[in-house]
Each structure stands twice: as structure tokens, then as C-alpha cells.
Amino acid sequence: MIFTSKVEQSFLKESKIKEFTTNIPYLLTDSVPKVGIMSALRFLEWASENEEGIISLSSDSSLKNFIHYTHHFLDNWEKKETRLILEKYGLGDVKKPNLSGLQFVQMAEFYPISPSQHNSFYNQVNEKYIKG
């Protein structure tokens, strides 16, 4: 199997890809929000296995679906509708991950400015990822 992640395997099956036409495997979805769901579920799968892990998250606004669905799944982890989605994508037996132990690493180049400034990397991470 090319993908070892249960989430990735589930999305591969859903995409109905019979064979890869490139050297690098890929996943197909039918919409941009579905990419957000897929990336949020894969992140939560990884975070559940690496609660003290190191992560680097983009500050790009195009990741709004990732942020939205990550918060949605975490906030509604025990609700029936969410449980059905988690089960569908291989996370039915995964306990809700605790993200408080994750460490952020800056991946983009930012001009050094005070963390208290509204457009600082620190502020962007807090507003977009931590506070949601």
C-alpha cells in the first residue's frame, strides 16, 4: 500500500483511483472544502500519534478550510455526526488528540517584528490556529 495512514487510505478508496500515472502518489477530492476535511483529519490522525510533536503550519489564508474543520472535529468529537465521519475515514477508534503538547516551528520568512504587533507571525499563529 502506498499510503500507510488510515485517513489517506480512506480518501484513496473514495477517489476511485485505479493506478497512479506519476511517480509521486496523489489523492483526488471533488472540492476545496473536501481538501480541508482531508487535511484536518490527517493532521488529527498524526497529532493523536504525536502529542509532543513539532509542527509547522502555514499562515496562508487559503488554509481556512483546514482550520475550520480541525476546530469543528475537535469541538464536536463525541457527537454522532462527527463520529460517523471519523469512522468513515479510519479514525473511529482514535481518542480525541490533545494539541497542547505540540510545538510550533516557523516555516516562513518574516521580517523580525515585535510579537505583539498585529501582523507578526506570533499573532497570526495565535489568531488563526490557537484561538481559531
Q: Where are these predicted regions, by residue range?
A:
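Glycine-rich phosphate/diphosphate-binding loops that line cofactor/substrate pockets in enzymes
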Residues: 39-53
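Active-site pocket-lining segments that scaffold enzyme catalytic pockets across diverse folds
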Residues: 52-55, 82
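Glycine-rich beta-strand-to-loop/alpha-helix junction loops that act as flexible
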Residues: 56-62
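Short, active-site-adjacent cap segments at secondary-structure transitions
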Residues: 62-65, 111-112
